[in-house]
């Protein structure tokens, strides 16, 4: 591979379960060899590669001979615990063919929610890359509960791209990319090759279809792409079975759907707010508050809150939505849900008299907010 043809220097590659199993109930080792070869070629050409791999539960099912996916959380976590060791062993053996070492990082949302743990994870990633070691990331499904799960490896890979300041995120799936209709039911569906802006019409196109044995569909890939591109990371969604797909993507050949990055990406702290934080509640705002936040860059005051939804403590990240339920911003609350139920719709000057204390006039300060 000619280094001059490469447009990126640090790349995150996400492999979905449907890619790793080729639609079967076990890992497709032959295909994994080819994917490892492509990533090894990038490493040899000077491109740093981070691999975000699904497939732990599928590997566990194969190793233990489970015919069907169990219903209980405990048994799914059992399969993840057994399968993760098999998965990392397989990747370690494959990359060793090319003289490359791997390092495993198992993450949960809690690791990304806490600022110190987030920075520690970033340091670990950078240390591995500095030594020419391929970081292999997966969600820690063996211990994760719904409250601390990222939820799918599409979103986890987007967060990994932010963690390591990647230039490109490649989401490989069983589809060629994003289409203007469902290609499985509409033979006239056309591939969308370039996306500059992600809006509601595009989200509607993505739908909620789930691929194969995994948990992520095109909707989750679109969500991941939006997170990454806001942080200045380009994104490509493509078929994991397209010949040379990883190398073609990095060499800027036409493959899949390409999402351009924002020209003015979010600064580091706001990237963390958008990508690392668990969103635990929702604030419905009036039109005046919406305009102040989106058009004037103001902080959110209690007066503009119409309704509070969810249970959360001070410091939680919340969805800020309009009267129709459309999210337009996300931010860290200085007040708990209990507090906000008492001060919603009230003037900031009344907060101390209503609560007996205050944490400032702003419910969500503009420095702790990301306008979407």
Swiss-Prot record:
Q: Where is this protein found?
A: Cytoplasm
In this chain the PUA domain maps to 280-358
GO BP term, example: L-proline biosynthetic process
Key word Phosphoprotein present: no
The UniProt record lists the keyword Transferase: yes
The organism's superkingdom is given as: Bacteria
Catalytic activity annotation: L-glutamate + ATP = L-glutamyl 5-phosphate + ADP
Q: Which residues bind substrate?
A: 54, 141, 153
Q: How far does the signal peptide extend, from start to end residue?
A: none
Q: Which residues bind ATP?
A: 14, 173-174, 215-221
- Family the entry assigns: Belongs to the glutamate 5-kinase family.
Q: Which NCBIfam families match?
A: proB (TIGR01027)
Tell me, what does this protein do in biology? Catalyzes the transfer of a phosphate group to glutamate to form L-glutamate 5-phosphate.
What's the protein called, per UniProt? Glutamate 5-kinase
Gene that this polypeptide is encoded by? proB
